[in-house]
């Protein structure tokens, strides 16, 4: 049982870490775009040169640099489009790899070993329908009321792998949501401004007539 549990935990860790692996591979592909790096370096060099020359005194050179900049900018945009297309192809390939190596085997393993007992709980600690759910999994919700599945005799109730995984994933998801809420950037409070129309109307209010003695 321990070996199967370790295999399932390994699949679970890989499934949770896969978005990070996906992101790292995409960043690696973007960082290793040699042509884009060269084009960006050339553009920075020309921009630095443009700041040091005068458009009036060195008009020919200044115009030539501008044309070169336009050409480089177009090449940069084309290279970015090709890079995005490459990233999309990489994403599609990674999805197929994940489906074959993680999703399908993990799903089959969960169905195949879903009823495997993980640990025992004292009987009577939870209501009877929960104990049946722990022991038989989700099938107890349908078969329990028909008395087809019953809680076993004895002083303890086993917790099946399917229910244990469900509880574990819920805990991991909740902790992830808490972490995201704690690390999310604070949203600044909206500034309250007075409507200029209201200010104009207030300034144009006629004076109040004072009583004449």
Swiss-Prot record:
Residues 26-98, 176-213 are cytoplasmic. Residues 193-213 are annotated as: Disordered. Keywords: Coiled coil, Endoplasmic reticulum, ER-Golgi transport, Golgi apparatus, Membrane, Transmembrane, Transmembrane helix, Transport. Pfam families: CHD5. It comes from the Eukaryota. InterPro entries: Get1, Get1_fungi, Helix_hairpin_bin_sf. The chain crosses the membrane at residues 5-25, 99-119, 159-175. One of its GO terms (biological process) is vesicle-mediated transport. It is found in: Endoplasmic reticulum membrane; Golgi apparatus membrane. Residues 55-99 form a coiled coil. Required for the post-translational delivery of tail-anchored (TA) proteins to the endoplasmic reticulum. Together with GET2, acts as a membrane receptor for soluble GET3, which recognizes and selectively binds the transmembrane domain of TA proteins in the cytosol. The GET complex cooperates with the HDEL receptor ERD2 to mediate the ATP-dependent retrieval of resident ER proteins that contain a C-terminal H-D-E-L retention signal from the Golgi to the ER. Belongs to the WRB/GET1 family. This is Golgi to ER traffic protein 1. It comes from Kluyveromyces lactis (strain ATCC 8585 / CBS 2359 / DSM 70799 / NBRC 1267 / NRRL Y-1140 / WM37). The gene is GET1.
